[in-house]
Regions:
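A glycine-rich helix N-cap at a beta->alpha junction
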Residues: 59-76
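N-terminal catalytic cores of NTP/NDP-binding nucleotidyl/phosphoryl-transfer enzymes
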Residues: 1-58, 94
Length: 106
């Protein structure tokens, strides 16, 4: 089974680039033959957005853009990155055993 994994960093309000670069291509790939994981990469945004209320506002705006573009949350795994503690746990474990240069795929 094919899998799709992509996310959008809520470092600003949704724009055409988000739609053309991530939302539309992802929605075009969705069918009953693939498992999809589409997310809001809010952990990636904390270096650019320091105000928690603003980050929540931008995260909600990104979620609304996905949904307004036709995403059916009943047919995909749609989540906020910070809601999955295993992501930060894995990042911490990897940072303990691997240099950053080894974590980049080539």
């Amino acid at each position: 089974m094919k899998r799709i994994l992509t996310g959008i960093t809520p470092s600003g309000y949704p724009h055409l680039g988000n739609y053309i670069g991530a939302i539309k291509p992802s929605l075009d790939l969705l069918d009953g033959k693939c498992e999809s994981f589409l997310f809001i990469a809010d952990l990636h945004a904390v270096i650019k957005v320091s105000d928690p209320k603003k980050l929540e506002e931008l995260s909600n705006a990104i979620a609304m853009a996905w949904l307004a573009s036709g995403l059916d949350p009943n047919k995909t795994n749609f989540y906020r990155q910070s809601d999955v503690p295993e992501i930060t746990e894995l990042a911490w474990l990897l940072s303990c055993i691997a240099a950053v240069s080894y974590t980049h795929l080539r």
